[in-house]
């Protein structure tokens, strides 16, 4: 699991955690709020590991018995709340795993720590049951609520927890991590970074995804030659990408990044801001051929296509209209 120094970004949260541990100002309840893949589980796990570390420093030592237990997921004083229903944490889940066990003192450490992933999936009854525990917890208890949307939690829970908001990580840090740690080439790191939009977990997932590479190659092949396609070829292209229907949002985002590259190069002639660097000759050619108005029309059409697909408008019709707009501009 490592330590806080290995975490990319989130320096403000890490500083807060270290200070809280060093100054013995640990709260009884925290909300870690951020997108899926933003690092909530990692930060909560490192926080828990630090609180239980036998050396008592602001970072886990990764050497003591407690740290090794935490790293392997087998520490008796770290309880990760689970739920059988995929989209719901029930009142029974909270009562059985939290309320009914929290008064049992820690087995070996100074704290007993509860980590509740997807806390925004708690029912109102489950939240009310947890609220009673948060209001009057034993001194040794620390509860971490991990959520993508803290607004779905009761105001009374929000007001009784310390809020730690995970913000987007700088693109330069994500790209550096992908190239140094995952050893992926520059051009691929650029695409994954642009696509991840500040989310390290998403960037890593994309970098390791063969399917994403396939979707990217399909999009690139279409964009390189769409201006030369006949209507029948465009219809065939739409039929071909129906296999990616579940990932069509990703497919459209790739096209959007491509045309932002075209617009950026047309306006500045600068290559360092281009994402699809491995396709620069095609980016240059399309920047030369297309007008500013045409590129803007394509970007607007992409947004319309996304909205229409969300509204369940016929897939083939939406994509054919989009591709014709791209071809004409």
State what each model feature region is.
Residues 1-49, 69, 139-140, 149-254, ...:
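Charged, glycine-rich active-site and insertion segments that engage polyanionic ligands
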Residues 2-125:
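Clamp-loader machinery-focused feature within the broader ASCE/P-loop NTPase space
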Residues 2-3, 118-133, 191-193, 258-259:
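Solvent-exposed, charged interface segments at domain starts and junctions
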Residues 32, 116, 130-131, 147:
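Hydrophobic residues in beta-strands of the RecA-like P-loop NTPase core, especially within AAA+ ATPase
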Residues 128-145:
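Conserved catalytic/switch belt of AAA+ P-loop NTPases
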